[in-house]
Regions:
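Long amphipathic alpha-helical segments
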Residues: 7-123
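SAM-dependent methyltransferases
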Residues: 1-26, 122-125, 334-335, 339-356
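Ligand-binding beta-strand-loop-alpha-helix segment within the catalytic cores
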Residues: 105-159, 185-187, 191-235
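Structural signal for hydrophobic packing residues in well-ordered secondary-structure cores
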Residues: 55, 73, 77-80, 92-99, ...
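Conserved phosphate- and dinucleotide-binding cores of soluble alpha/beta proteins
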Residues: 194-356
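Conserved phosphate/anionic-ligand binding catalytic regions in large, soluble enzymes, centered on
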Residues: 53-68, 102, 164-168, 311-326
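Histidine-anchored nucleotide/phosphate-binding helix
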Residues: 173-182, 258
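Glycine/charged-rich beta-loop-alpha catalytic/anionic-binding loops adjacent to active sites
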Residues: 30-33, 38, 42-52, 131-136, ...
């Protein structure tokens, strides 16, 4: 049984990104849920561009990247084995670097696909099919790990508690809600809208609603008021990177909510495995995106001509604002993340299942 069973529509593998017959279909999260549309990519370069263009985000690019590698394998299907591997290595570089801040994790994904391709080439199997099978196996593994994270996270939720989220944490949102439902924890969710793409309003809130929870969307300037007046018990987010020195890289706005949570005495739990590729915060590159997006809302211009925008995609939260890093094996202090790997863990995105 696949690990996406019983999760919301947009967390089903086929509705994230899927390779079939020489193309990759990616759910266009820029317009979901108002419209359910898929962007069709005919080349691996188009997959990389779709990732860069935010067609999919949060953990969506990791599935899209793997499916893009399946497409690259289709593109080079008639080449010799050596040329095929060289082509896939080049495709891996293009896809892994589609967005700079997440390049470390993306590299783990595409490298796993290359290992699956090598096995398929040696056995004479269909390389694209092998990469798709590998991706499903790795998604099942990752979803299973995130389900364990969710179990530890939901331990921190009081019955009938209030939980504030940030942006769209993808798999952890669905698994967190599934576990809360199983435990009959009747939590209320408050989702900051997350401008300029509105991931909180459109994606997180939709998943919460689809899974039967009481969910309220708030604007990005309301967290302090809501924490003060609506009985928020926990603030939680996923992370685009958790540095080994305890700094958390996530959607811009996370830092300011963490500051308010600390002031209010509300714990902030971040979910995800530490990133060994980010030994400290100085290894992080913050992606700067098109500032024009800040001057509009869902395509409607909100500022006059001549006004400038500013759009860092991520910010960095220091460890003293983090109550705990919730992993698949327990909750760690942000100051003691090396212990996660000392305990024998490999991380959320690192290949730790057999290549199929």
């Amino acid at each position: 049984m696949r690990a996406d069973k019983d999760l919301a529509f947009m967390l089903q593998y086929e509705n994230i990104a899927w390779y079939n017959g020489g193309e990759v279909r990616i759910l266009d999260r820029r317009c979901y849920p108002r419209k359910v549309e898929f962007v069709v990519c005919k080349t691996h370069q188009e997959v990389a561009q779709a990732i860069a263009d935010m067609v999919t985000q949060s953990a969506g690019p990791y599935t899209a990247a793997a499916m893009g590698m399946a497409l690259a394998a289709y593109e080079c299907r008639d080449m010799t084995a050596d040329r095929k591997l060289a082509y896939l290595e080049d495709a891996a570089d293009v896809i892994a670097n589609a967005r700079p801040t997440t390049a470390q994790r993306m590299r783990l994904i595409v490298d796993g696909c290359i290992e699956a391709a090598k096995t398929a080439i040696l056995s004479g199997a269909d390389v694209s099919a092998a990469i798709v099978d590998h991706t499903i196996a790795m998604n099942d593994l990752r979803y299973g790990k995130v389900e364990k994270m969710a179990e530890y996270l939901v331990d921190m939720f009081p019955n009938n508690g209030g939980v504030m989220t940030q942006c769209f944490g993808e798999t952890i949102v669905g698994q967190m809600l599934k576990i809360a439902k199983q435990r009959k924890k009747n939590i209320r969710l408050f989702c900051p809208e997350t401008r300029p793409y509105f991931q909180g309003a459109r994606l997180t809130a939709t998943v919460c609603h689809d899974m039967g929870f009481d969910v309220t969307v708030i604007t990005d300037n309301m967290p302090a008021y809501v924490m003060q007046n609506e009985q928020i018990d926990v603030f939680t987010s996923a992370a685009d990177a958790i540095c080994m020195d305890g700094y958390v890289v996530n959607k811009v706005g996370t830092f300011q909510i963490a500051i308010v949570a600390k002031y209010m005495g509300i714990p902030y739990f971040v979910t995800g495995a530490p990133d060994q590729g980010h030994t400290d915060v100085d290894t992080v590159t913050i992606e700067m995106r098109d500032p024009d997006f800040v001057l509009q809302a869902m395509g409607v211009k909100t500022a006059c001509d001549g006004v400038k925008g500013y759009y860092p995609s991520f910010d960095i939260t220091p460890p003293h604002l983090v109550s705990g890093v919730v992993t698949d094996t327990g909750i760690y202090s942000p100051y003691d993340l090396h212990r996660y790997f000392a305990d024998g863990n490999m991380g959320e995105y690192r290949q730790s299942a057999p290549v199929v």
